[in-house]
Amino acid sequence: MLPPMTYDSRPETFAHSQRVGELMIQLIKEALDRSTCHDRSKTEPPEVEVFNEFTPRLKELTYGSSEYKEALQGMGAGLAHHYANNRHHPEHFDYGLNGMTLVDLIEMLADWKAATERHSTGDLYKSLLINQERFKMSGQLLDILVNTAKGYGWL
């Protein structure tokens, strides 16, 4: 039996819980929307021609190697268009990773994981380390991405 109360915190706690759920649904909806249209810009000009030419080559190269970087440079305007139209890429933002939202980061991490699955030498942890240097990623953000990948069985 509970002692008599002058204040019952439960209604406020339930209201708070409900509000947190509503706010989380905003983020979840955005993530779901992105999951159904990820990289669609690659299926139309000016990107499709560039990705048709370079994707088979990129699959054969080691991610982060000088040859890989050279191939990216060769993608020119098609890749620039892709970055400009897809906010899950740090290159989309003037301030790189620091311009991104949590939903951008979630899509980016999923993209990096899926990309490693397209390469015979793909390794998400190695890719994260390469991208830490490439994008000047903080140790804290690297830890968060590694923890997330481990939590979902990606590492």
Please provide the spans of the model-predicted regions:
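Metal-dependent phosphohydrolase cores
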Residues: 1-155
